Curated annotation (Swiss-Prot):
Matches recorded under InterPro entries: DNA-dir_RNA_pol_insert (IPR011262), DNA-dir_RNA_pol_RpoA/D/Rpb3 (IPR011263), DNA-dir_RpoA (IPR011773), RBP11-like (IPR036603), RNAP_asu_C (IPR011260), RNApol_insert_sf (IPR036643)
Function (record text): DNA-dependent RNA polymerase catalyzes the transcription of DNA into RNA using the four ribonucleoside triphosphates as substrates.
Subcellular location: Plastid, Cyanelle
Region of interest: Alpha N-terminal domain (alpha-NTD): 1-227
Region (Alpha C-terminal domain (alpha-CTD)): 239-315
A GO molecular-function annotation: DNA binding
Comment field on protein domains: The N-terminal domain is essential for RNAP assembly and basal transcription, whereas the C-terminal domain is involved in interaction with transcriptional regulators and with upstream promoter elements.
Annotated protein name in UniProt: DNA-directed RNA polymerase subunit alpha
Length: 315
């Protein structure tokens, strides 16, 4: 088993919603760097769970193409600001947040009223500017999910007063990786994986990598216990069952049935040991009876008898 170390060599906050971390994974066997790096990158960007505002109901507003009295931003601008808000939900159930504020003031996420299960990551994120004596009142839905959720038009039609928002659930916004060769003292060649991760602050760098690894483990774990059926054995079992079927199941005429019985042909297995030519050699078994047997085998069991005798070699 490959033994390697994972080390965070750099961590910094580039902005309130953009945090950076750089990790080094080494030593890896040749070829493992790109395998691990590419797999982690894909999972970090698409499968790490996050939280987002998915819909909002604004007092006095029934569609997104309008303005709000006393508010600097129109509805579309407000929806965009809500879309970019970073928060974290500790429950899988949808939650409702609220805001009711009177101006004049600048509204930030610090003004939100949230349930105890939801945490605002950046309390200074800007939301809107409200004029003096104007009131901004709204409710918004908070949900957990993965990736990017585009507005569902059917769901929009069923929503009452709520304006849907394209939700960005991804806590990891960008991932880069590089692979370098390293040379050990014994001249052995190994690889070093350099992983760069940009996050929105709702998940720690350690948690993001840990969650990504967990997703990959769950994805590949079933392959450890996979059972491949032996198709040859199953085919043989099917053939054995067919061979044991009595010729009565073919529902032949009395003449054809009696001729086969006198020839010691009692089952489909016995019948499969003869060809069409050999059928005609049975006493009192004519062309009509042979055709009846051939057609019954094909129609009921999908089996065709060979036309001519086969040379059977004895060892």
């Amino acid at each position: 088993m490959t033994q390697f170390q994972i080390e965070c060599v750099e961590s910094k906050v580039e902005s309130s919603c953009n945090q950076y971390g750089r990790f080094i994974v080494e030593p890896l066997e040749p070829g493992q760097g790109i395998t691990i790096g590419n797999s982690l990158r894909r999972v970090l960007l698409s499968d790490i769970e996050g939280s987002a505002i998915t819909a909002v109901r604004i007092a006095g507003v029934n569609h997104e193409f309008c303005s709000i009295p006393g508010v600097k931003e129109d509805v579309l601008e407000l929806l965009l600001n809500l879309k970019n808000i970073v928060l974290k939900s500790y429950t899988n159930e949808p939650q409702i947040g609220r805001l009711k504020i009177q101006g004049a003031c600048k509204v930030t996420t610090a003004n939100f009223e949230l349930p105890s299960e939801v945490e605002i990551i950046h309390g200074t994120q800007y939301v809107a500017t409200v004029a003096e004596n104007a009131i901004l009142e709204m409710e918004f839905k908070i949900e957990k999910g993965r990736g990017y959720k585009i507005i569902d038009k059917k769901q929009t039609e069923n929503s009452i007063d709520f304006l849907p928002i394209d939700a960005i659930f991804m806590p990891v916004r960008k991932v880069n990786y590089m692979v370098e060769e390293i040379f050990l003292r014994n001249s052995e060649i190994k690889e070093r994986l350099i992983l760069e991760i940009w996050r929105n602050g709702s998940v720690t760098p350690q948690d993001s990598i840990s969650q990504a690894a967990e997703v990959l483990l769950n994805l590949f774990n079933p392959f450890k216990k996979i059972n491949f059926e032996n198709t040859d054995d199953s085919t043989e079992q099917t053939e054995d069952k067919i061979s044991q079927i009595p010729i009565e199941e073919l529902q032949l005429s009395v003449r054809a049935y009696n001729c086969l019985k006198r020839a010691q042909i009692h089952s489909i297995g016995d019948l499969l040991n003869v060809s069409q030519e050999e059928l005609l050699e049975i006493r009192n078994f004519g062309q009509k009876s042979a055709k009846e047997v051939i057609d019954a085998l094909q129609k009921r069991l999908g089996i065709s008898l060979p036309k001519r005798k086969t040379n059977k070699k004895e060892n």
